[in-house]
Amino acid sequence: METEIPRSTEISETLLLPETNLDHGEYVPEWKEQITIRGLISSALLGILFCIITHKLNLTIGIIPSLNVAAGLLGFFFIKSWTGFLSKLGFLSKPFTKQENTVIQTCVVSCYGLAYSGGFGSYLIAMDERTYKLIGSDYPGNNPEDVINPGLWWMTGFLFVVSFLGLFCLVPLRKVMILDYKLTYPSGTATAMLINSFHNNTGAELAGKQVKCLGKYLSLSLVWSCFKWFFSGIGGACGFDHFPTLGLTLFKNTFYFDFSPTFIGCGMICPHLVNCSVLLGAIISWGFLWPFISQHAGDWYPADLKANDFKGLYGYKVFIAISIILGDGLYNLIKIIVVTVKEICNKSSRQHNLPVFTDILDKSKTSVLMREKKKRDIIFLKDRIPLEFAVSGYVGLAAISTAIIPLIFPPLKWYFVLCSYLVAPGLAFCNSYGAGLTDMSMPSTYGKTGLFIVASIVGNNGGVIAGLAACGIMMSIVSTAADLMQDFKTGYLTLSSAKSMFVTQLLGTAMGCIIAPLTFWLFWTAFDIGDPDGLYKAPYAVIYREMAILGVEGFAKLPKHCLALCCGFFIAALIVNLIRDMTPPKISKLIPLPMAMAGPFYIGAYFAIDMFVGTVIMLVWERMNKKDADDYSGAVASGLICGDGIWTIPSAILSILRINPPICMYFRPS
């Protein structure tokens, strides 16, 4: 996810209760039995769906919520439906265990994770000719030789050589991070509790209702998306996606509700603070800042420039958004490194500050808890992953990657790739440890760091491509390492084998290396990707290419006062984060998140309206019936997102066949 947000908030507290009700006599299958053919088939189908959803979000707004709940729920639904169907035909089927459910969820998440860390909405597409032309052929540092257009084969090959290294670099530390440090990995813990709840009587009944709820809203979302298509016309300015719900004046400043089930679903999943931060960012930028700068057209920048010219207002939009993102990312990177070092060095602090389960249980339950913990520890450590296997795997893959990547990206020399792999394990540890403490995984922040360093060293002789490729290497390793450790936590709490988790991650990553490029290619061939006036703007492609150019050229060619404004917003992002950490929780939870505020500065205000509608729905629902909201909101939101995502497939096929919508619904002043 480009905008990285805490993910644990999407699961209600009631799902944590089954943790204390572990049945000590339950059968735990061997690690090979936890990985089934039906599970892998379900994972592949769900991986396709979630890759499409991730691409759609990545290419429109760049904010991707966690889909772990939907993956676990739909995995449960697929296998239960399959076993139920076979039983009606008179066939006996293997019992569906929580370990198999965990394997499916892990496989799906590792598969669709590559749709994000693979850079299809950021660093890879930033290399293409459209992004080059959008910035301008006469723009300093934007050279025609720094162009590599997307290709299905080279993108697939690139993913295969970079995506597996992160799985090997931290495997030897799984005992240290899960058992010794007792890192919580809130999203992994919450997902485990959700899966545990599915496989007891009470939880199975609720899960059945959640599946029905998800199916209902998935159908509604699919039908609505199909209905909208008939009015969307040719081009990008027709239909409900451009409905001036707040009036034509505000519509010109991108303030309108576009009836998007995906964005409403995102608003229901994301914390209220994230949605309010996004809306605040939209109000500051499109309500005040851009109109103010527009008044100085002809003074600060030439008045006759095109809307997408970086010498004009467009330059302010992109570079101020970059400044906020970098300020927020730098602060959190330093914060997590400091917390990591402090926690490692201070053993007593680690024991008292980390939320260990024994802290919240009565003394009468201590013996039960100890038996539960002992059983988990035994199962987690039972199937070893040899140290020599992990080390040799990392070294071997790094050697192959060091040889192949310079063939794909000639400006990125082999010694840059080698240096990246030497420092990557340390950065992966920092990110994984930080994710375990705070639930914030920040692969794009580490990637941008590598981007700037490599681009500035290489310079004008291919620095843009080299920086973007280095960003991809770092993002892939750091992201997959954190995901693996989080899945180890999920497996630990569901009595799943660590070896089955690791093998499933390998299988899911292999699926993702094929599925993610194929599903992206569907978008690439069917839609006008990167059109700033279209639906699939690919907003972060321009931002990443500009970052690389900035690393090569410096700040000399920015529009008038742009550097001063960028510095101001960069410092503001640092200060806001510092205030959030220094104030009491009652106050800090009301302070906006700079990273969430940055998106609308460049993309527009319309998706902020949609996401705020989602948060209003949740607030009203929680006020009316909090238990139902806790139980079913995730299913409703996932249904809205999945239904709209499924419609992308027939929509893309119609576009490829040149079948256009029959009606253009358009609005103009009377």
Curated annotation (Swiss-Prot):
The chain crosses the membrane at residues 35-55, 59-79, 107-127, 151-171, 273-293, 318-338, 389-409, 416-436, 450-470, 507-527, 559-579, 601-621, 636-656. It is a multi-pass membrane protein. One of its GO terms (molecular function) is oligopeptide transmembrane transporter activity. It is found in: Membrane. InterPro entries: OPT (IPR004813), YSL-like (IPR045035). The keyword Membrane applies. GO terms for biological process: iron ion transmembrane transport. The keyword Transport applies. Pfam families: OPT (PF03169). One of its GO terms (cellular component) is plant-type vacuole. Keywords: Membrane, Transmembrane, Transmembrane helix, Transport. Belongs to the YSL (TC 2.A.67.2) family. Up-regulated in autophagy mutant. NCBIfam families: OPT_sfam. May be involved in the transport of nicotianamine-chelated metals. This is Probable metal-nicotianamine transporter YSL4. It comes from Arabidopsis thaliana.
